[in-house]
């Protein structure tokens, strides 16, 4: 059996040598500030592992554009204040050319609000939230947006005649925009949100929300929640006798749910996925990922959708570095990102100035009675 142990991100001393402007090829430092402990630690570590797998492949092949890659990461525990502090620290200490793999509605909102990205002229490539984010400079998504996920779920429900829906989501700064988007999308599919409930941002306190759905039962509930909140909701809702079909957005993390909940509780749960499955060979990207995992000893965590997403983010960074050429700078890297148009083999990522959402890929995974995942 493969063992999963912490991997070591070396070359930190070399990492600190990369200035914002480098005349010639260099080792490029990528910094991740993410929940490596706390409620969402499994996903944060999996994303990190995916980034590292991509960078390892590139380094073994001689780099990209003459550059090799080093990943430096810091733990924010899912706390927005720590996200800002750790980002400020890693920018000063390690001089990264890009950031990657950030998590959480409030953490990313605070990062954007802080002005750090504009001040440092540094891109964030790849992040996970449960809200609909506006397109802003320096923030690049390598996955489909939450609007795409909601549309996929709503269209599927409409095709099977389910029109009375519940909405469960985090009560944060983006809640108003989120609910407006859900109302717009469901109206187009002929559905109606008949019950709404929230949970406090940054927590997994779901009991009040469950009471609302038990009192006003919808046919299906759309869960726009973190993995820990979604797991708590599913568990308590089923124990309370809730019978609605449950649909979650990709951030709910199907592996975390399966680890916490039994097969009977998980049966019939559907989750929108924004990457190809890491568990089956469905194209060149999936095969490359599977082969890389098989050849990598001592992975920190088991393969997962979050790891696949980190791998995609890593490959996107590598492609931007290739396009940037030998003279490395944050400004040149951002300019190169805006030209990225790449087919990874079953998954396309593309950006251009003013369009920083790089993918529209969404498919639904459903957990069967045997606890298996099928698309």
Regions found by a protein language model. Give the residues of each.
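Short, polar/charged alpha-helical segment
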Residues: 40-65, 181-187
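Extracellular/periplasmic periplasmic-binding protein-like sensory domains
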Residues: 234-308, 367, 371-374
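Extracytoplasmic "Venus flytrap"
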Residues: 31-52, 74-80, 103, 168-176, ...
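Beta-alpha junction/loop-to-helix N-cap segments that form part of ligand/metal-binding clefts
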Residues: 29, 42-47, 61-133, 231
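Extracytoplasmic ligand/sensor domains, especially the bilobed periplasmic-binding protein
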Residues: 96-194, 245-263, 267
């Amino acid at each position: 059996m493969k063992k999963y142990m912490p991997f070591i991100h070396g070359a930190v001393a070399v990492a600190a040598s990369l200035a914002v402007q480098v005349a010639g090829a260099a080792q490029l430092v990528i910094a991740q500030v993410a929940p490596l402990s706390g409620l969402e630690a499994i996903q944060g570590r999996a994303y990190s592992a995916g980034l590292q797998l991509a960078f390892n492949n590139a380094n073994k092949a001689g780099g990209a554009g003459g550059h090799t890659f080093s990943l430096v990461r810091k733990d924010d525990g899912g706390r927005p204040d720590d996200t800002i502090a750790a980002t400020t620290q890693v920018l000063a200490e390690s001089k990264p050319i890009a950031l990657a793999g950030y998590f959480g509605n409030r953490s990313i909102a605070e990062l954007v609000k802080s002005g750090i990205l504009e001040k440092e002229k540094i891109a964030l490539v790849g992040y996970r939230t449960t809200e609909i984010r506006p397109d802003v400079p320096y923030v690049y998504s390598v996955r489909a947006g939450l609007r795409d996920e909601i549309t996929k779920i709503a269209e599927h429900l409409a095709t099977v005649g389910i029109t009375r829906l519940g909405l469960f989501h985090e009560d944060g700064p983006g809640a108003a925009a989120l609910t407006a988007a859900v109302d717009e999308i469901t109206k187009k599919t002929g559905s109606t949100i008949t019950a709404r409930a929230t949970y406090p941002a940054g927590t997994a306190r779901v009991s009040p929300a469950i009471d609302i759905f038990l009192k006003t039962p919808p046919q299906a509930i759309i869960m726009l929640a973190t993995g820990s909140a979604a797991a708590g909701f599913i568990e308590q809702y089923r124990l309370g006798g809730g019978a609605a079909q449950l649909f979650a957005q990709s951030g709910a993390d199907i592996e975390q749910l399966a680890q916490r909940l039994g097969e009977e509780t998980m049966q019939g749960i559907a989750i929108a996925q924004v990457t190809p499955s890491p568990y089956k060979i469905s194209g060149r990207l999936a095969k490359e990922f599977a082969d890389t995992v098989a050849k990598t000893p001592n992975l920190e965590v088991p393969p997962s959708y979050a790891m696949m997403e980190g791998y995609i983010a890593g490959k996107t960074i590598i492609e931007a570095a290739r396009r940037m050429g030998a003279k490395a700078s944050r400004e040149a890297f951002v300019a190169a990102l805006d030209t990225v148009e790449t087919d990874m083999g079953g998954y396309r990522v593309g950006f251009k100035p003013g369009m920083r959402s790089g993918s529209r890929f969404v498919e639904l995974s459903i957990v069967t009675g045997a606890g298996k995942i099928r698309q």
